[in-house]
């Protein structure tokens, strides 16, 4: 059984569906859900132990406690950070903020987007080399030409001219210059 933690559907759901489809085609049972529901299902034994694939290993008290519950239910934790560190281009800082010794201890495997975050993780956390894998991201896989037809189906064809107003300015209001 594979449990895929989905936090922000607009950001993560397509790539989680890709992972789920590939895993299911190989005979795995896959469930995509929010973390709270998955933990409740595991703790109450409604869900059987398996792999809990989470969207980050950011070290926080809450995350560490949640991971303890997941591990105590019999699951293994794996992760790929959904935020990737690509914008700031300061992978070492990203690795220090988004990972910690305690959360790395709890994880069975950590997947990286590419060589930059992979090398930073290996350099900053050398005791966990055997857990860190350079796999790429399913979000990036969806950019490949083989998925163009997938994106065409979701394209909205406006009937009139329109104005797009973005309501997400995270990178624009970052403390430091990111570009």
Language-model regions, residue ranges each:
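Active-site and donor-binding regions of nucleotide-sugar-utilizing enzymes
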Residues: 2-155, 165-174
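A solvent-exposed, charged loop/short amphipathic helix patch at secondary-structure junctions
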Residues: 176-179
